[in-house]
A protein has these predicted regions:
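Thiol/selenol-based redox catalytic cores and closely related redox-interacting motifs
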Residues: 117-192
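Short active-site neighborhood of thiol/selenol oxidoreductases, capturing the structured segment around
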Residues: 44-65, 170
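Low-complexity, glycine/serine/threonine/alanine-rich intrinsically disordered linker
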Residues: 294-400
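A short beta-strand-turn-helix
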Residues: 31-52, 200-209
Length: 400
């Protein structure tokens, strides 16, 4: 009998560990995700709110579908109290199209943040759809995590809930009180996080074979000596030193600088990272950025800095316009600068290609080039005439 009691106790301890995923008072790091409509949401942008509420959504989960009705009702109650509601989808199998179809079928009116890399769900340790969690923007900690209420179980559902866990927590937060019940058991469909189970293997990610090639293909065009990046990826030590900053800008999508929606069409010169590349980089950083074996490809990388990138196809340029050198102060506000260059061609021509070559990529932010006639009188004297002005070429960081 004593052995049986010990076994039961152990089972209860193990079971209790597995009930809850997100921990109350857990600190939440900043992230950015797109919703099903293409809108971008950065967590820390909502710092002026009283609370941020998330329902973990997944297509096909009956509990999440059922809970969404009450979740929308609570949104209408608390939106006037500066509480923002979201859904979070970390399912591997759900696509943007299928999420849109699910939203239309069940009348979801809230942003569904699509965590296609699963990095955010992993970091939050989400386990099931139907789970709700509340973030307090004053501390960026989890204020409540668990079930929305006690109305739903796996086999049954009550007509009315007798315990209103989420509503009670939001009442307390918006009234400036501490949350009395910060954690409850959540029910729903288990979410498959394969990389979470393979966490031990993240230390085996190869810097030489996996990490450095991603950086060379996607980052070193800017992050190199003389490039427009603020620091140069010259070797492993530099990358390791900036690795935590890299993780931050990857999670918030500040890097790589690419804003087009990857689910719509194909874009030339796409600088975005694939979901697999994002996972590889972040998991490598989270495992301590191990050096591993092999050469350092960054030491041997040949970074092309072609002055005239069209030369292989079109040959040397027919016309080169030099802009006078300008000294830019290291700090302060610089007025918008206009440079006028006389067109010396003297005849109409067809333009096949143009290119802007910055003198210092670390200083130049952008260029807009136009051509046309100059105003000789009026308030815009000495400036281009809008009626004759035509655009020619632009430049901004990251443009090829």
């Amino acid at each position: 009998m004593k052995d049986l009691k010990i076994l039961i106790t152990l089972l209860l301890i193990l079971f209790s560990v597995g009930i809850y995923s997100i921990e109350a008072n857990q600190k939440v790091e900043n992230f950015r995700l797109n919703d099903q409509l293409g809108n971008s949401h950065e967590l820390f942008y909502y710092s002026d709110h009283e609370a941020l509420v998330f329902l973990v959504q997944g297509n096909g989960c009956p509990i999440a579908r059922n809970a969404s009705v009450r979740f929308h009702e609570l949104e209408k109650i608390f939106s006037e109290k500066k509480v923002k509601f979201f859904m979070l989808n970390s399912n591997l199998q759900d696509t943007k199209r299928s999420i849109l179809e699910e939203a239309a079928s069940y009348n979801y009116q809230l942003p569904i943040l699509m965590d296609k890399t699963q990095l955010i769900g992993e970091a939050l340790e989400v386990t099931r759809t139907g789970e709700v969690f509340v973030i307090n923007p004053k501390t960026w900690q989890i204020a409540y995590t668990g079930a929305l209420d006690d109305r739903l179980t796996y086999e049954n559902q009550k007509k009315e809930a007798s315990e209103h866990f989420l509503k009670d927590a939001l009442d307390e937060i918006t009234e400036g009180r501490a949350v009395t019940l910060a954690t409850t058991e959540s029910l729903g469909c288990l979410i498959n996080f394969p990389e979470q189970r393979n966490k031990a293997n993240h230390k085996l990610i190869s810097y030489s074979e996996d990490i450095a090639p991603i950086l060379i293909d996607n980052c070193t065009a800017c992050h190199r000596k003389g490039g427009l990046g603020p620091w140069a990826m010259t070797d492993y030590n530099m990358v390791k030193g900036f690795s935590l900053m890299m993780r931050e800008v990857l999670r918030t999508k500040r890097m790589p600088p690419w804003h087009a929606d990857p689910s719509i069409g194909h874009f030339s010169n796409d600088r975005s990272l694939s979901a697999g590349e994002m996972r590889t980089l972040v998991h490598w950083i989270e495992s301590g950025s191990p050096r591993g074996k092999g050469k350092d490809p960054l030491l041997e990388a040949e970074i092309s800095d072609s002055v005239w990138s069209n030369e292989p196809e079109l040959g040397p340029p027919d016309y080169v316009i030099d802009i006078p050198t300008t000294d830019i102060p290291a700090t302060g506000v610089v007025d918008y600068k206009y440079h006028f260059v006389k067109n010396k061609i003297g005849k109409d021509i067809w333009v096949r290609a143009t290119e802007i070559i910055p003198g210092d990529k670390a200083v130049l932010h952008h260029v807009i080039t136009s051509f046309g006639e100059i105003n000789v009188k009026g308030p815009r004297k000495g400036r281009l005439n809008f009626r004759t002005m035509k655009g020619l070429r632009g430049y901004a960081p990251g443009i090829n």
